[in-house]
Amino acid sequence: MPVKKSKQDPRSKSVSNLRKINPSGKREESFFELVYEVARQIPYGRVTSYGAIAACLGTKLSARMVGWAMNGADKINPTVPAHRVVNRVGLLSGKHHFKPPGKMEKLLRKEGILVKDDVIVNFKEKFWDPGTEFL
């Protein structure tokens, strides 16, 4: 008999459902949940990169996994400011995950971040390093 697949999107689970229980019975946060916790600390008007979040979590080579986490961030509660996470040169590489088109850039501009041709103009000035500036 075939297994019936759930129609619920796994990314729509609340943050509390993202925790695992380890053998000792303690709750353990998932990688995605840790990413969301770091992203929530990004100050208004600042941005960081996927790689900077990965490095802050001690997984320097996991920038793509941070990107995957950001792809589903719009379904997480409390909210995650995914628009503040860009690639290592300030490119809005995740912009196609925002609806309607242009929403990521609009949110950044609203926070005083200049964007030209999908790249943050003042990236070095606006960059927030969670490894050294974590709130």
Predicted region positions:
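Nucleic acid-binding interface residues in structured DNA/RNA-binding domains
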Residues: 2-135
